[in-house]
Swiss-Prot record:
GTP binds at residues 216-223, 294-298, 352-355. It is a peripheral membrane protein. It is found in: Cell membrane. Keywords: Bacterial flagellum biogenesis, Bacterial flagellum protein export, Cell membrane, GTP-binding, Membrane, Nucleotide-binding, Protein transport, Transport. It comes from the Bacteria. Belongs to the GTP-binding SRP family. Its main location: membrane. GO terms for molecular function: ATP hydrolysis activity; GTP binding; GTPase activity; signal recognition particle binding. GO terms for cellular component: plasma membrane. This is Flagellar biosynthesis protein FlhF. One of its GO terms (biological process) is bacterial-type flagellum organization. InterPro entries: AAA+_ATPase, FlhF, FlhF__GTPase_dom, P-loop_NTPase, SRP54_GTPase_dom. PANTHER family: FLAGELLAR BIOSYNTHESIS PROTEIN FLHF, SIGNAL RECOGNITION PARTICLE RECEPTOR SUBUNIT ALPHA.
Length: 429
């Protein structure tokens, strides 16, 4: 039997290593968590099970003799007088070990849960590993069956994967065109369904007016997007009805950027210091038709971020908060940003850095899943030219144009199918 150990960052990568080296017939003997990932033990070519042992007549004779002697001793013990039996019980009682002290009992009681906890943790890890193994195997089987039974659907799956769309969004889209026989027609219908799934505001937020804040992680492009929106507004409505507000006193030079923008556009700028009431800061701007707020991109664990989000969520202010998402970010980064900033109440999102993005599927999928209207698309550094009001069909067309040129690998497709078997809590991540 050939036994090997494999090391990888996660279970799926480890399974890929096993399949590549030992083939699909390899058996998984065990898995455990190690520094940096997973250790998987796999084997190939199990030896045949050992043949059953032959009967040993001599041993059977000795066993029968021993059994007879035990029966004789038991009968003799039963026939002995009661007094002798009482003395024997006393003798045996003296030989019993002493009862543990209270301190020893307490120590043992505390030790048991610790061992139990360690055992439960080990069992939990083993179960998680088994679940991931099952997911990988099911994904591989399901993908293989789809290619064999429905090659057209498999081709559409590949195209959606090239766009960066996750399995949980691709599956319902493909179900809508499952009965369409022509591949080209099915693809056009699929993109139409995808376009309808992308929500956009009925009215340009700048035309609607009010108080609008841009929130999101550091580096998403909040300040640059705010500058584009401010310039766009001034060109259409003039500078008299616009005011700029900066809540970013943490990043070096952030407020200076807003001040410079205000001077260029001839627009008043209000700086909100930490601890200052946002309600009081906005009170003098009540007559302005449009107020744009730039916020700080702080770590999710920073208490200052919680205070900032609570201020923006105040019902008395009626702030429309838009999540700024860089389309260059990974799916997990986008999901984490949404989970952090959703607490302030999001009116929609703005997608930035489209000119640098490798795909748009991840950001589109988040907007669709969370029902976030996509307000604007920012695709360059020019102010205000590189900011467009979002149109769902244009966004989908751009996503198609950015799809990866190469076909996804079989392992990538199997892994995507494996995601369909994950528990909802794990998919949410």
């Amino acid at each position: 039997m050939q036994v090997k150990r494999f090391f990888a960052a996660d279970m799926r990568q480890a399974m890929k290593l096993v399949r590549d080296e030992l083939g699909p017939d390899a058996a998984i003997l065990g898995n455990r968590r190690v520094a940096g990932g997973i250790e998987l033990t796999a084997a190939l070519d199990y030896q045949a099970p050992p043949a059953p042992s032959k009967p040993n007549p001599a041993l059977e004779v000795e066993l029968r003799k021993t059994q007879a002697r035990i029966a004789e001793a038991r009968a003799e013990l039963t026939a002995r007088p009661a007094e002798t039996q009482r003395k024997d019980r006393q003798l045996f009682a003296e030989e019993k070990p002493a009862r543990p002290t209270l301190a020893e009992s307490m120590t043992a009681a505390h030790a048991k849960p610790q061992v139990g906890g360690q055992t439960l943790e080990a069992m939990r890890f083993e179960l998680n590993g088994l679940r991931e193994l099952i997911e990988v195997q099911l994904g591989s089987i399901a993908w293989g069956q789809l290619q064999h039974q429905r090659p057209q659907q498999a081709n559409l799956w590949r195209r959606l994967q090239r766009m960066g769309l996750p399995a949980e969004l691709s599956k319902p889209l493909l179900e809508r065109v499952a009965a369409v026989g022509d591949t080209r027609q099915a693809w056009r219908m699929l993109l139409a369904h995808l376009s309808r799934a992308v929500q956009t505001p009925e009215q340009d937020p700048l035309d609607a007016g009010g108080v609008l804040a841009l929130v999101g992680p550091a580096g998403a492009g909040k300040t640059t997007t705010l500058a584009k929106m401010a310039a766009r507004y001034v060109l259409k409505y003039g500078a008299q009805s616009l005011a700029l507000v900066s809540m970013d006193s943490y990043r070096i030079g952030a407020q200076e950027q807003i001040k410079t923008l205000g001077r260029i556009l001839n627009v008043p700028v209000t700086l909100v210091d930490p601890g200052q009431s946002l309600i009081q800061a906005l009170a003098p701007l009540a007559r302005k038709r449009m107020v744009l707020i730039d916020t700080a991109g702080l770590p999710a664990s920073d208490p200052a971020l919680r205070m900032q989000l609570e201020a923006l969520a105040s019902p008395s202010l009626n702030v429309k908060n838009y999540l700024v998402m860089a389309t260059t970010s990974q799916s997990q980064v986008l999901k984490s940003a949404y989970q952090t900033y959703r607490h302030c109440g999001l009116a929609g999102c703005i997608l930035t850095k489209l000119d640098e993005a490798g795909s748009l599927g991840e950001s589109m999928a988040l907007a669709i899943a969370q029902r976030l209207p996509v307000a604007y698309l920012a695709d360059g550094p020019r102010i205000p030219d590189d900011l467009q009001v979002a149109r769902s069909h244009q966004l989908v067309s751009r996503a198609v144009s950015l799809q990866a040129p190469e076909e996804p690998s079989e392992d990538a497709m199997a892994e995507m199918f494996a995601g369909l078997y994950q528990q909802p809590a794990r998919r949410a991540g």
